[in-house]
């Protein structure tokens, strides 16, 4: 249906696209994110986010996690997850150990994150986490995979950081 009328096969061949307003194409503003900003100091037990297979619901755990020089260090069991405020308002970054994700040698980031649509990234090392964050910002949203300190794949979603122009 378009304009109250049922569409025919011929109608589907028509281009119904409309220009996207510029302000909807520039909505990812994370500012400078550094290793220092995503470090998580911990000594002893700390809060952990446990992923549950095939579920959107997570579980809160308190566990002893691996550390190096007083900071959390990812290993084969625990990855790091960061939530980065991406609307350019507060610059807040939340960091926690994530159990059950299992990424090795990389990071995955996205700007599609209901309810706030902030940038979420999970990975096993800071270089890839930072590269993935930068990749999402450079593409003004979407999904990014980083490995070896660089972006290796991207699905750009530049309309409000949530939708494709195509």
Model region roles, listed by residue range:
Residues 1-166:
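Active-site microenvironment of metallo-dependent hydrolases
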């Amino acid at each position: 249906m378009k304009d109250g009328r049922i569409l025919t096969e011929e109608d589907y061949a028509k281009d119904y696209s409309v220009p996207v307003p510029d302000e909807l194409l520039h909505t990812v503003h994370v500012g400078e994110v550094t290793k220092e900003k995503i470090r998580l100091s911990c000594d002893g037990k700390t809060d952990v986010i446990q992923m549950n297979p095939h579920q959107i619901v997570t579980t809160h755990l308190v566990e002893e996690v691996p550390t190096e020089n007083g900071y959390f260090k990812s290993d084969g069991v625990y990855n790091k997850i960061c939530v980065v405020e991406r609307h350019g308002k507060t610059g807040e970054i939340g960091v926690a150990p994530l159990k059950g994700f299992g990424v090795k040698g990389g990071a995955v980031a996205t700007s599609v994150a209901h309810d706030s649509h902030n940038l979420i990234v999970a990975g096993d090392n800071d270089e890839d986490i930072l590269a993935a964050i930068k990749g999402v910002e450079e593409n003004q949203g979407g999904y990014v995979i980083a490995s070896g300190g660089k972006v290796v794949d991207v699905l750009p979603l530049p309309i409000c950081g949530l939708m494709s122009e195509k």
